[in-house]
Amino acid sequence: MSGVNDIRSAFLNYFAANGHQIVPSSPLVPRNDPTLMFTNAGMVQFKNVFTGVEKRPYQRATTSQKCVRAGGKHNDLDNVGYTARHHTFFEMLGNFSFGDYFKDRAIELAWKLVTQEFGLPKDRLTATVYIDDDGAFDLWKKIAGLPESRIIRIAGSDNFWQMGDTGPCGPCSEIFYDHGDRIPGGPPGSPEQDGDRFVEIWNLVFMQYEKLPDGSRPNLPKPSIDTGAGLERVAAVLQGKHDNYDIDLFVALIRAAADLTGADPQGPMKASLRVIADHLRASSFLIADGVLPSNEGRGYVLRRIMRRAMRHAQLLGAREPLMWRLVGVLVREMGEAFPELQRARPLIEETLRLEETRFRKTLERGLSILDEKSASLKQGDMFDGETAFTLYDTYGFPLDLTQDALRARGIGVDLASFTDAMEQQKAKARASWSGSGEAAAESIWFPLREKLGATEFLGYETEAAEGVVAALVKDGEEADTLKAGESGAIVLNQTPFYGESGGQVGDTGFLIADGVRFRVTDTQKKAGDLFVHLGTVEQGVLAPGMALALEVDHDRRSAIRANHSATHLLHEALRQVLGDHIAQRGSLVAPERLRFDFAHNKPISADELRCIEDIANDVVLENGEVTTRLMAVDDAREAGARALFGEKYGDEVRVVSMGGTDRHGAASNALGWSVELCGGTHVKRTGDIGLISVVGESAVASGVRRIEALTGHQARHHANHAIQLAKTAAGELRTSLDDMPARIASLMEERKKLERELSEARKKLAMGGAASASSGATTGVRDVGGIKLMARSVEGIEIKDLKSLADQGKKQLGSGVVALVATSGDGKASVVVGVTPDLVTRFSAVDLVRKASEVLGGKGGGGKPDMAQAGGPDGAKAGAALDAIAAAMGA
């Protein structure tokens, strides 16, 4: 049972046998806490259960939770690889009680597991309790039989946990394993506690109080249990290892990296192998959970982790991308416990390979500058922070890589001057921005929201209603009236007009009263839930308090509804075809078309696009009902609803479902095939979409792809236009639509043949009469100081053929220089110069070709002494360019 996979299974099965529900690990991107960078503890997915906001169908749970600590307050990145127990990615084993059992049962379950199931000797175990937790102290004596000398009272935050400044909190009790006196260090609470002899393997949190704003801590009506045991630490103890990196999982990863680089796992580069093994896990699991490298947020943290590992791969002598080649080993070790690794393996490998390929250029440039700037420094010196900032700001070389590269030489970085340089740059950026009228105008909406309250939205039920003008805004200020011809904004007490949000554009239409007509050209949401109608008064005068008839443009709204529903179907179809890593990165839902951006880092093939389109249209043709329901946000997520990360959702959310639960790919407990949290407007049945036609696929950023599509009438018009173009083309080719591909292929082959023949004819024409070159009678061959120069201007010959002609000319001359200028239809010119071997000590083809390039308006040229090429935009000066070569030879 000592293998990591066996230990994980034993832990979960033990608690399952004791009435706990085995709950899968939640993603590394927290679903219910937008303030948290990454999931960093087992209790994160149960946070709302502990606070009473969420109810689950079980009161006891057990998990092995994926965790990352590499950003913000919990940042272990700099220590990884250099200590025995720091990791960016780790698994947290845990058991939880939500108002069921409490302190006595938690201690009993933990003690039996570590001593009976895991077989750890009791005399190697020590427990800590909070300084005034007499109950836990007595229970450890009673249940575990520990002597008082091995139950240590600890004051401070290490043994008292709280969720925040207020809320559930309680004392902790930790179990420590004693590695023995061969390892330096003392028990917890002693002056030597920072040594490695005593290792914490399990933390039991007894949530029994609620901290109030006044600082008091009354008892919770239902106390709960939250425990956490680091799997890697537990495995090290059970495998008789003092170092986490010596457990079977890491040994496999480190050995694979060592085999690929030739490094010794126990040699001087041991830390680099450990960094690669650890960071491979973090990178792979983050990518599998939908995070891709970028320059902000979670993507930036991922990029830092990846690039730190890639820096260490370079230190090991890797000349080609390395990390992607290790993914198979990771999948073999952890893929059974975490199937998402297997599903996302192609994406993980491709992302790592591409990122490492890109980073090598940055790394080489940055290291070169770093070596140059630090050459005079010795151990104990500080590297200039301003230079470190220049490396970061100008060359994209992260600060932590600068620190890491200098660390091996015992050189630090002046962080104070680095921070000063960073702040100076920010100040310059602020000073260079003078603000805008638009930004100033935006400031009005927050006080208006405070005064008027939220606008009631009626648009899910109707496109026409009545409303009362609550406020008028003109030129960024409240106005008493809006007159005919004036533009401004209107806030109503209620509206059927949808305000732009969630990628869906705002509605247009009219606001009407007797003698008054206001054309709405856009509707926006300001200050959260204030609907603002932008437009122009076409007739009459508007004033606050006026009652208006509100009419949304029906045809435009219908087209938007179809496009929004189609976006949901395409999102799910993309996930079905490309994998579970697909995550929305942005969208545009307009009446004319839709656009959907998503995490994926390689182009989608034509076959994949066709499959995505077919799957989405199958759901359209089923004409199933599109259902919307209001649900508690956590109930919706439990039912499989997908949320757009970054969106803030209230306690109650709108859930839009399409497609039957019996469709392939629908979750067993889902509300439908496509289930998303969405506040937009949608069709009533999928058939109302009409048709979905994907018309574009492209890259918009690193790791982000975009598809564009049409629906309904727009899709039909697009299809009809394409068919008509095909028919016209078939007519011109005198063939049928079915035979047109073969006809085009035949014509293309014929064209290639003719182009080859034309190229050969041009080359023969260009070199015509050269056989007489040795006699000096050939046109284009001149004598320059006793040296033969074959100088010719030709048309329509490509650069590769021009080089071939130059080689041919050199052979024909025997001894001499060949200069050929080829002009093209766009007026540009290419020039090639060849020098026979006997003359390269006198004339350099590179020097001669650069003289010609100057005349042609080009910028230099390059090649070898015997053959060089260049170009320029001014082909009309081909003759002058040849004369310049002759002059350079001494004519």
From Swiss-Prot:
CDD domains: AlaRS_core. Its cofactor is Zn(2+). One of its GO terms (biological process) is alanyl-tRNA aminoacylation. Pfam families: DHHA1 (PF02272), tRNA-synt_2c (PF01411), tRNA_SAD (PF07973). Binds 1 zinc ion per subunit. Keywords: Aminoacyl-tRNA synthetase, ATP-binding, Cytoplasm, Ligase, Metal-binding, Nucleotide-binding, Protein biosynthesis, RNA-binding, tRNA-binding, Zinc. Its EC number is 6.1.1.7. NCBIfam families: alaS. Signal peptide: none annotated. It is found in: Cytoplasm. Its main location: cytoplasm. SUPFAM superfamilies: Class II aaRS and biotin synthetases (SSF55681), Putative anticodon-binding domain of alanyl-tRNA synthetase (AlaRS) (SSF101353), ThrRS/AlaRS common domain (SSF55186), Translation proteins (SSF50447). Consists of three domains; the N-terminal catalytic domain, the editing domain and the C-terminal C-Ala domain. The editing domain removes incorrectly charged amino acids, while the C-Ala domain, along with tRNA(Ala), serves as a bridge to cooperatively bring together the editing and aminoacylation centers thus stimulating deacylation of misacylated tRNAs. Belongs to the class-II aminoacyl-tRNA synthetase family. SMART domains: tRNA_SAD. The lineage of its organism: Bacteria, Pseudomonadati, Pseudomonadota, Alphaproteobacteria, Hyphomicrobiales. This is Alanine--tRNA ligase. HAMAP family: Ala_tRNA_synth_B. Disulfide bonds: none annotated. Zn(2+) binds at residues 564, 568, 678, 682. It comes from Nitrobacter winogradskyi (strain ATCC 25391 / DSM 10237 / CIP 104748 / NCIMB 11846 / Nb-255).
